[in-house]
Every structure is written in C-alpha cells, then in structure tokens.
C-alpha cells in the first residue's frame, strides 16, 4: 500500500475512533477484556501526551492476566509516545558514526505545508546554527523594600521614587484611615503571620528589616495578584505569564526571583492600554529588564555567534511553532479527557488506592473493634485558643450590682436575705473609690426622698461603712454556705421529692457524729508509700475551716487551673469561691457553647472580685493533644504560672459492672486518670524548663471513698484509687520540687451531675451514720483547704484530707443502700396506687355536677398599640405644676406622638419585647407570625367544611389557636429574625456572601465556537471587539453567527466567598403586600420606600391617626412636613441602574427617580399625606435619623410646620456590605465563627472583644407635632424633644473617623451659677413681663375709648361702624398681647438660655433647665454604640466629658444603653430605632442591658460617670434621656428627650384631664384599626390617597388661604 494511502487511512481511523469515543459511553472494562482476552493483543500503543490508559491496563494485566499470559507465553508490550517512540516507529539505535565535518553549504529542508495537522513533523536541519541562549545569572531574593514600594505606589498614586523609606504608612496616607487599613490588609496577605503589630506606625525601612528576617524572597499573594492582573489586562490575548518568564530567562538569563523583581518594576511602568502584539511585549519586557540590570549594576549579557553559510532559523518562530503544536495536542487531549476523564480517573484512583485503603480499613476496623466508638469520639481534641473568653471587668459589674441592690431593696424585690448577703459581699469584695461615690450618692438621694423607708437607709449605710473599711484590703472568700441536711418526701400521688433543710444542730456537733472517727475531717501525711494520720495537720485544718467562716481567705495573685466546672458541680461552686477571693482562674469546658460561656460570664459578673480574672477555653481531658496544648497555652504568658490545679473533670459510668465495661469506661478512665497524670506532668515540665522551684503548683487530687463500695460504676473506682499512687511518686520521682499534692477524699455530695440520681436516698444514707454534703458545702471545704495554712504544709509533703463523711466505714453499705432504696420506692409505689384508687373512688361516687370539669380557657392575644403610662396627677405631676405652669410656649414645644419601625426584630413592639426579656409574649408571637406570613386570618368555610373565624396556618390552611402559635412557630421565628446568617431569598438580587459574584477580565487564548445572535447584538460585538469578532449572517434566519477570536477580551463571572456572612435582615417572609400595598406600587418603588410607607402608617396609628387627612381639620396643608432621611437611599435601584444596566438586564426606564434619597419622602406625600409643606431630606450617614429630628424641631420651633414625619431608612445590599468590609468597619464573621461566636453574639458594643459592627436594614419613623396641637387633638405624647443638635469635628483626612464636635453641646465658660437657671427666678421675671403686657392692654383700651369718643363727636360714623371698629381694634390689641405673651414666654421659658451671654449657659444645661431639670436628671444615655473599637471609645469619652464639665455628681452613674447588640447597625435608621427605645424606656422605667457585653473594655473604666449594664435595670423614674449618633463625614448628633409629665405640669389639672379623655378615646379607635388591618391586610392601602384633601377646583384657593381646613 502506498505510504500516502496508509497515512490517509490512519488519519481516517483516528477520526473514526475519536468520533466513536465522543458518541458512545466509555466501556473501559469491556474494552480491556476484549483487547487482552479475546484478541490477546501483545503490542498495545496509546495515542496521547501521557500514558494514562496504558498505566491502567498494566494494573489490569497484573491483577487478572499475569498467570494466563505466563501459561500461554504471551509477552505484552504497552507503549505510549513518551516512553516508546523508537519502538512505536520500529526505530533502533543507529551504529556509531564518525564525527561530521564542519557544516558547509548543505541545506536540508522539509516540505511541511501539505502535511495533515496531526502529522508529527520531522526536525529541521539547518546549515547555520543560531546564537545560543545567554548564561543564567545567579538568583537572589526579591528585596522586601521593593515589594513594599510596589504595594504602596499604586495605593498612594505616587511615583515610587517619591516614597521615602523613612516615612510611615500613617504619614504617607495623610490621615486616611480607610486607605491605611487597606494597605495593612495587603501586607497581611503578602506576608502572612509575619507582619508586626501596628505596621502602619513603623518607618518603611524598619518594617522592611522586620519582614526580611523570615521572607523567602518570592512574591506573595498581593503582589502576585497585581502581576497577574497586569498580564491579563495589559498584555495581548494568548500571551501568558509563563511566556513572559520564558522570554526573560532565554533572552536575559534571569532566574525566577530576578524575574519577579522585573515584574515589580513593570508594575510601576504599566502601559496605559493593552499591548497589541508580541513585539510590543518584547519591547516592554526589554525596557524593564534593562532598567533592572541598571538598578542592580549588572552587565547586560551578550550572545555569542557561530559562523555559518546557512541561513539561521528564527528561534522565536520555532518557539511559536512549538507552542502551537503543544496547544493542538492539549486541545485533542482535552476533548478526549472530557469524555473519559471522570471514569478513568475514578478507576485509576480506585486501583491505586485499593491496596492501601484495604490495609488502612483493616487497621481502623481493628482499632475501633478494640476501643469502641465512644473512645474514638472521646479523645477527639477540641482545644482552640481562638475561642477563649476572658472576663476581667469586675469594676463594671460592681457598679451594676450596686444599682441592682438599691433598686431591689427600694422596690421590695429582694427575694431573700441570702441574695442580699451575696450581693453585699460581692460589692465589698470589689469596692473602690467609685463604689464609695456611688453609695454616697444613693444614700444622699434616699435621705432627701421622703417616700424612701428609713429601713432601707441603714443597710446601705452599713454597706458603705464596710466598703470604707475594706477598700484597701485584698478580696477574700468567706464561707457563707449554710449547713443543710437532705430531706426526701413522698407526695400524695407517690412522687419522690428531694429538698434540703437547715440542720437542727450546729455544724460542729453534726460532724462529730461520724461513726468512723470523732474528728470531722481527719488529715494524713504521706511519707513515701506510708500514709499516717496527723493530729497536728488535722488541727490546722480545723482552724482553717473556722477562719473561712470568719475572716476568710484571699487568693489574690493566685493562678488556678480548674477542669470540670459544669453547672451544679463541685467545681462550679469552687470557681465562684476562688473568684470571690480574687484568683485568676483558667477554667475548661468540654461542652463549649453560647449557653456555657454565658453561664461562666454570669458567675464572674456576680462573684468576680478585685483583680480576679476568668479565662474559659474548650478542652477535652480525654485528648492527649488537648492536655499538651492547654498547658502550652497557659505558659505562653509567664504571668499565668500556676499555683493550683484542680482536675475535677469526670465522666459518669453509672450502670456498668465488670461484665458491661465498654469504650465509655475506657475513655472515662483515660480522662480521670491517664490524662490527669499527663496534665500534672506537663505543668511540672513547664516549671522545670523555667526552673520555678519557689512556686510549686498544688494539685488538689479528687479522691473518693468509693473503692468499689457502690458498684456498677465502671472503672470510676479504679480511676480514683489509682490516683493515690501519685502520692508515693512525689518523693520517688523528680518532679516533687514543682508540684505539691493535696488529696481530698470527697464524700457523698448531693446535687452534682454524678450523684443527682442518688439524691433521693441521701437522707437514708445519713441514717446509716454517713455525713452527706451539698455541692456548695463541699466546694467551700475544698477552697478552705487551698486557702489556709494547710496549703503551706502540702509543699513539704503530700497530704490527704478525708472528707468522705464516714462513707467508707459502713459495713455492707451497698446492701443497706439497696434495701433503703427498695423500701423508699415501695412506699412511694404504695402511695401512688392508693392515690389512683382514691381518685377512682371519687369519680365513681361523685354526682354528675361534681364530675364535670370546667373547660380550659384558651389564651388569646390582645395586640395593642403603645399608650403612655397613665400618671397619677397628684403624685407624678402636681409637685412640678406650681413652678412649671405657664412657663413654656406650647406652640413651640416639640413632642413625639407616635413611632414605628421595621427591622430585624420586626416592629417596635416585638423589638422591645426581645430587648426587654429576650423572648416574645403571646401577643408578640402572634404579631411576628403574621408579619412573617406564617399565619393569616380566615373568616369563612374551613377545610372541614365548618365556618371558622380565626388564624390559620398559611401553608396548610389548618386552624390554629393563639396560644398554639408560640409552640409551633417561635423557634422558626427566632431562627429567621434578628442578627443571623444572610438569607439570599430575601436579599437584594439574591445576594449570597458565600457566592459573591464579580467579573474578571480574560483575553481569549483560542477561538471560541460560533454562537447565534441577533444582527443588532452582532453589530455591538463587532464594534467592541473589532477584528477579534467574526460575524457571518444567515440569510435564511436573518440572525448572525459570531465567533470571538483569540485575543478578544471578555468578562467572565466568578464567585468568591466574602467573609461578612451575618447581617440583621428584616424577618423572613415580610412583604409589603401583607399591608395592602398593590403590586404596581411594589414594582414601581424601591424596597426602602415600602419600608417607609409601612412605618409611616404605623407611626400615624400609634399617634391615634387613622386617616392622615385628619390633620387638615386642625392645620393647613403647608404645615405638614416630611423630614425622613437616609445615608444612601434606594440602594436596590442604584444597583439596577449601574450593574443591571451594564449587564443589559431588563431595567425600567424611569428607574433613576428611585435612586434619589428624597424620592421616598415624595412617595409618602403622594400616597399618604398630600401635604404642601416642606420635604427636608437629611443625609447624615449613620446620623441621618438624628439629623432628621433636628431638622423637624427647627421647622416646628420656627412655626414653619406643626406636624413632621421624621426618621430614617436603609437597605442591606451586596455592594455596600462589601465596601464596609473592605474598610474593616464590619466584623469578620469567619473570625467570629472561629472564636466560637454565634451570629447573635457578633455585635458587642463596649465589649473588650468587639471587632466591628454588624449591618442591618429597615426603617424608623416618629411623628412630631407641637405640644399645642397634640393637646388639642388628644394625640398620645410619648416624650418631649428638649434639645437637638448636629456638630462637625475638626480638620483631618479620615471621613469615617469618629469626632468630638458633639462636646460643644456642653459648652459654657461660667463656673458661677446663672440665676436664670432657677425656674422660680424665671417665673418671677415672666410674671413681671406679663403684668406689663396686661397693663399695656389696659392703656391701649383707654386710647381706643378716646378714639371712639372723637368719632362719636364727629358724627361721621354710624353706631354699627363704631361697634365694628371697637371689636376689630380690641381683637388686634388682644392678639398683639397674646403674641407678646407667647414671645416673652418663649424667651424666658423654651429657650431662655439662648438669650444669655455667649457661653454662659450650655445648650444641654439650658434645655434641661426649661423643665426644671439638671444634668443629674439625665437617667440614661442611648449610645450609637456600633461595636467598632474607635467609636465606642470616642463616644463614651464625649458623654463622660459632657457630664464632668457640666458638674454631674460623682457616684450618679449614667447607665449606657447600646441597642445595636440586638438590632445591628442600620445606618440611616439607627437613630430612629434608638429614639423609639428611649421612648419605651421612659414609658416603662426599664433600662435594658446590653446582653452581649460579656466583658466591658478596660479602657472604659476611666469614665467614672458611666455604667455599662448587661442586665435590665428597673428604675423608678426616667426623667430624661440622651441620644447620640455619629455618622461618616463628620456628622455628629445629640438629642435630649424629657418625660411628658413635665409638659403636663404646664397646663393645669382640668386641661390635663380633658386631654387624657380625648387621648384614650383616640387610642381605642387606633387599636381597633390595627386589629382590623391585620385581619383584612389593608393597613397601608386604606390610607393611600388618590386625591388631595381638597377638590381640584378649590386647589389654588386652598393653598393660598392659610385658614383653609378640610
């Protein structure tokens, strides 16, 4: 056959094989069987770049055909191009030939143009050899300084030569903290785990030296990304980074690291646009390489040459041909592997791993079979230092406890003397100068208050005296545990009930009744293996026990490791005692969770004393690794060198005898013995390494008298008994200098996890002569052993204390115990049966009337709007009425008559319930379930065919009663509301932080397959890509085929994971449609407008306004203003306008209008209020709501409006979330999860561990009116807006930096009290001015009489004219007088302080004095409290300095509320939510605690006027609140709200009673409307207007007539 025909057939065969491969599924096993079995092929060749199939076939031959091949003498040869080229082509080693002569003019050329693309080309032989590559120069590390400059230059937008190495990052960025954070983030990415603390404050030269010490000389993540970005965006398509490296190596001889240095230079010299050809790239690389050689003083390499008569073959052409050939082979293999890779790789991996997996599986099965699952799980390590919790803010909890003590005593809420004793002891143990100031203030206030019982003063005075006496001493643990005896009773229905009662006899006498010994706790001394009773040590212990109840023991400065401190355990009570004594304790927990850490935090908050510290870490004592890591963690800080070790961790093995020992018994033995010993040894090793022989750690060994005594407890007894062998080892081994041993034989202890099932027989045990103990008693005894003189004796020799209570000395104890248990159970069973029989007898003999049981009443929700608390006029108002009556101009007093919100916790009512109690009431559950769409109201035929009126499940339509709603939906509501993982289903554009979309620019390296599109689209593609887009038109369809060629630049979507995955979204299921808003409006407006519409209607309902047009019965349409603000407005619309429009998605044509921030206010006016008054749209970032409040107050006080809607709104969207994350303003949720935090813990204002705010979304609205209008209409008044102000900061370069401009609200220079601050003084001045006004009226009336007399004499006017003239003039005279009265009242009342000399009276002092209040009357401060480090420090400093400057009394601590721990930070809406919270606080007197403030920042301790409660404080009276907000862009805002009782004191009893009557009537109607709206789903739709309050014909006249009402 002719070679050309063979070649053609081979080509056809290959194509057919590939087509078959593509068209049919891979059947590799059958193929192998056919080739190897049926055909018995011996010569097998694989076509491809690597031997994938032949390797798999080799394993098949070895496993299945090796024996048969040997028997049949079959010799198989498996070949592939990479290892069998000569054999494939039947080429053999040529014979050796003599050296060729010098190359001459011969020229060997091969014609290749006619060869098929797949044909392997033969090498070209040229008569002229080109110049060879240059020699590679020696490699060297990339200097860190070059990397730093490369990172800084593009960020600073400076020439690299203009960046001095002596400068710092902070100086270079010019105060722009965001840019500084960004650069530091790049450094952390470039040099992971090597960047020093605060690198931005180090000179670049020092930073470079520091980083150079451990740098590997290669580019890191940040610079590599910059280089890759340059290659993809500036070099032509198809030109990769590897091409550039190859060019630099071959032409310039540069090794990899020097290539990196050239790329760094290239970053600084990037072309402004993409290079178009490889020639341009070569020039670009040559220029940068030459610059590098010059920079490094290297000689530019020269190439050698070889003379030849033949023309040289272009090396670049050869390289290009090779690259094209390689690309072709990759394409072919890619096609093949695309159809075979999945199965082949799976089979390959299976074959390779089968043997090793089988062996590993066999070994694992054997291990599991021997040890068991419990053992395997029980030794899994859980220690993680990142999850540590540190509690040391005892100073704040002491202030909180002092407030709680006084409030509970004052309100009669102290549950017992024991609680009073505990609180008082805790306060004394933490007393400092601040505590004394606080007590002084409380006592002084109580003495001045005639309503305070004198019996309250005495304990407070005694407490203060004790604090004075103990202020300088160290904290002490005092054993206050009562001596309790067990008591078991049996109820009438046969239930066993365990309780504890005080023992009848003194403790000392009870202890002496032990059968085993006449001494309570005998002490033995160990001498090697010999253990002997020591009367002297026993006596010492007795004295220590007595001292523990008298003077107590201090553990100040002592470091303790405690394992096994679960709730109710002995270790848990030991922890309380140690903290009370001032110890620094590291406690471990094997069940690390939010609940567990909260338990330990509450223990520290109550018992932690001066200097005490509590560290909590996860730890599994069954894990050897955890033991080692725990000890390393402790000794990483030398100040934590241990003084005591209490290894009390234990695992219950109840119910296991020697026939039932299992893997749990083994892991329990490992935890309670093996690893306990390892723990002691690891500590000894650390002390040995540090040569700490003067500070041995005392190990309290938890021994047991139960040496098999009780039985059925697995290996518990063996574990405890084996611990005793440590005692002789103390002297026989070498670690005795570092460890002291105190063995404590722990007797029967009631109420612990190991013994709680036996509590009911404790009384029977004591009847056997055994002393049992409560967990509190046993813990106090053990701590007494640690704290007294007894501990010093342990340092000399191991000691054993027998606190077994005689348990080990009772003969036949198990039998007696079993008998007692049987008797008890038998008696209980008898009573149970008797009770059952008695019940049956009663049922039998009872009459029908008695047998009937009343039907249980079902709980029903009564959802009501908030109503200001009814006040007792004589008690709450009358005391102020005498001085305040008539002292303000009510038309210019601003009051809040209604409020509403939509946020992560639903509306303002459900949010307050969560803030107040942490759960929802029945009403809250029903409202939240309705709001989330879980229930809907049904009135009609139900599923059963009956008529039903009530709530039904939205999904199933099943009827559901109100009281069933919490049980069915509460868990779901809690999961899908509040701060939580971002839920894509309710996020804008389905945003999922785990799949954050972005585009990357890619230059195509090969032609894409053609795709069909329209002519218009084809034209746009051609316009963009030019000759890189080939367009062909299909005449039949009219469409085009477009093919993008290599070099075309396309944007490819990618999904990355963003580490801000938690936010405070509105509750899942919320929809505006539920409020009756139509689909066309929902489709038209931005989501924030929907939020605002709902909140506006609900705020109006809260004001008692069912129809917004009701206002126009009392005011003109020009007197209704809208001041809602936001930081960014319609973010969803902004995203659509920019991103969706760019991506050519469907976007409505009028979208741009929804991006304007003022559009929301416009929609509210167009749909609801139809006002002609001002629309003010404040944009104050996070302070937008307070700026809105400030704007509205100005409008009302200037009489430009009488009603204002105020507040703010904000959305949560992907872009804003990402940008906040880039600024490091929000918390890194990945780091939070790594620290063991759950989403609801991640917003922690004022906490020492806070790390940034958590975003949220929503809206908040208040209705503001003048007090005069509110009283006239009977609107509920929730608070007086006494003062508002906005303030900027100072010169700087950081936009988000928190400012101090709000301090100006306290500006005043005079230290001498201004008499105008006296309400009585101003009242006298006002009365004097009013007398003058009244006299002026009389004078003008006399003049009027004279004028009328003249008219009468002239006889020119009729009597009717004279009468009209008199009436008109008298009216004007009296109106002028009223205006003068209002003006003088305003100047001497509302804003008297503004008329004083500049700086004489501060705005805060003056606005409070208007209502007869002072700086000490501010009862609570609602902080912006974002949970960022700098804001919380700055804001508290501002409030502290205001209080200090204005003379707030020492000890009058101002509770600070940080609402964002619950709601997150909603930016524009945040201030409105805070105002709502303050109104609710004033109405209830409750100050809610920041429950996420587990440990308050030590830096806040210096603010002596402030307190940071993490629990609720019930105050008797909240007179005034301060609200502060700080927004990006130097927006600082502060408002003062005052309780409405002070307003009511200005109007008189009669007017007040009339107002209350109108208010209550209005409130009842509004509540009915709220219920109706929930049932009918028309809360908003019923208020939506289609026409103005006036007819179109009357429109002009209505606007021009100020007296027009509708």
From Swiss-Prot:
Phosphoprotein keyword on record: yes
Industrial and biotechnological uses noted in the record: Apicidin F, like the other known apicidins, is a cyclic tetrapeptides with anti-malarial properties via histone deacetylase inhibitory activity.
Residue ranges annotated for the Carrier domain, each copy included: 142-218
Catalytic activity line of the entry: a fatty acyl-[ACP] + malonyl-[ACP] + H(+) = a 3-oxoacyl-[ACP] + holo-[ACP] + CO2
Induction note: Expression is positively regulated by the apicidin F cluster-specific transcription factor apf2 that binds to the eight-base-pair motif 5'-TGACGTGA-3' called the 'Api-box' that is found in all promoters of the apicidin F cluster except in the promoter region of apf2 itself.
Keyword entries, A-Z: Phosphopantetheine, Phosphoprotein, Transferase
Residue stretches making up the Ketosynthase family 3 (KS3) domain: 996-1539
Single GO MF annotation: fatty acid synthase activity
Matches recorded under Gene3D superfamilies: 3.30.70.2490, 3.40.47.10, 3.90.25.70, 6.10.140.1410, NAD(P)-binding Rossmann-like Domain
Catalytic residues (UniProt): 1182 (for beta-ketoacyl synthase activity), 1424 (for beta-ketoacyl synthase activity), 1465 (for beta-ketoacyl synthase activity)
Family statement: Belongs to the thiolase-like superfamily. Fungal fatty acid synthetase subunit alpha family.
Protein name (record): Fatty acid synthase apf5
Originating organism: Gibberella fujikuroi (strain CBS 195.34 / IMI 58289 / NRRL A-6831)
